[in-house]
């Protein structure tokens, strides 16, 4: 760059910093730009791997959507629990007025420290979210759900009033305000969303999410969660087999999938994932119905192997760390606990 151009640029940069504050513009090579994106685990090892960074990125908007009873709130509460384990503060904006506190506690959420709001209108919910984000004191904000963010005009109107596009405009305005503050305060904001059917669609996917298109654009990560089957013990249904597809990812390659089990009253089965991923990467041996690790049998059938790993957390952590090394993720600290002997 010649001297005149360099002087003109320096003057412009100086004026920008003077007018908008230091850090409003900078060179990428200055070292002040954050290169490593901080993440928080989803509570599912397979999903952390599918996301590419080892979890959900902080300072970004995330959307989790799917049909009813597919595990959207369960997955989100697991993220809240993981953030609290890291010493973070979480807020849950319960627009649906349907949060099961007992279930959240079973998933590992510290209810005492969880901030909860049950707003009356969509405007109130999004304003509360914006104030929490701007404070910089909250690490994760969950909005459950976009479909329940009812505009004030709709609540105050008559049943049957036609108010087209009102919720979409509300979401668009809120996200324009939220995005800059989310990045500045490094807050993770998760929107839970529902699925609707587009009427009259002959070709292509008739499914769409509520709240217009703004969230689709502003979200750095979008995840489609589906229940693919049931888990039974005898005749009793004890959980559901779940598939999550990362349909959008601005921080890593998208379109990856994760498969895991959600056990009722327990959440994502970490031990089940460790077994499946261990088998996939030849760390755990599977012969018929038996599972073995380092030549030692750990259980006949997945249920027994899962229970064995639950009883031996040090062994589970050892297998998980081997999986993490293979996949290029950071290892977790190992406890000093010794594994018990497996029962034949």
From Swiss-Prot:
Residues binding ATP, per UniProt: 66-73
SMART domains for this protein: AAA (SM00382)
Keyword Chaperone in record: no
GO biological process per UniProt: DNA recombination; DNA repair; SOS response
Family: Belongs to the RecA family.
Function noted in UniProt: Can catalyze the hydrolysis of ATP in the presence of single-stranded DNA, the ATP-dependent uptake of single-stranded DNA by duplex DNA, and the ATP-dependent hybridization of homologous single-stranded DNAs. It interacts with LexA causing its activation and leading to its autocatalytic cleavage.
Name of the protein described by the UniProt record: Protein RecA
Organism this protein belongs to: Azoarcus sp. (strain BH72)
């Amino acid at each position: 760059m010649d001297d005149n151009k360099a002087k003109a640029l320096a003057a412009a940069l100086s004026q920008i910093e003077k007018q908008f504050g230091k850090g409003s513009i900078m060179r990428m090579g200055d070292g002040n730009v954050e290169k490593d994106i901080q993440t928080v685990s989803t509570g599912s090892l397979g999903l952390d791997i599918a996301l590419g960074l080892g979890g959900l990125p902080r300072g970004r908007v995330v959307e989790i959507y799917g049909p009813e009873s597919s595990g959207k709130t369960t997955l989100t509460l697991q993220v809240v629990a993981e953030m609290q384990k890291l010493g973070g503060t979480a807020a849950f904006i319960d627009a649906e007025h349907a949060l099961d506190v007992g279930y959240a506690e079973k998933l590992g959420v510290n209810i005492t420290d969880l901030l909860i709001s049950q707003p009356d209108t969509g405007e109130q919910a999004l304003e509360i979210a914006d104030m929490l984000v701007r404070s910089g004191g909250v690490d994760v904000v969950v909005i459950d759900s976009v479909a329940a963010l009812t505009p004030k005009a709709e609540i105050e109107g008559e049943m049957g009033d036609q108010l087209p596009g009102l919720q979409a405009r509300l979401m668009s305005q809120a996200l324009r305000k939220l995005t800059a503050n989310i990045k500045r305060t490094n807050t993770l904001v998760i929107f839970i969303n529902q699925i609707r059917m587009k009427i009259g669609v002959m070709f292509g996917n008739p499914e769409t999410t509520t709240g217009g298109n703004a969230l689709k654009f502003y979200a750095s990560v979008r995840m489609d969660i589906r229940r693919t089957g049931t888990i039974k013990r005898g005749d009793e249904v004890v959980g559901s087999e779940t598939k999550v597809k990362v349909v959008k990812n601005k921080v890593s390659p998208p379109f990856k999938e994760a498969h895991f089990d959600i056990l009722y009253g327990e959440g994502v089965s970490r031990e089940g994932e460790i077994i499946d991923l261990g088998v996939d990467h030849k760390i755990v041996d599977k012969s018929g119905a038996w599972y073995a690790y380092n030549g030692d049998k750990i259980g006949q059938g997945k249920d027994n192997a899962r229970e064995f790993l639950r009883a031996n957390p040090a062994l589970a952590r050892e297998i998980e760390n081997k999986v993490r090394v293979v996949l290029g993720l950071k290892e977790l600290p190992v406890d000093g606990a010794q594994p018990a002997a497996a029962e034949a």
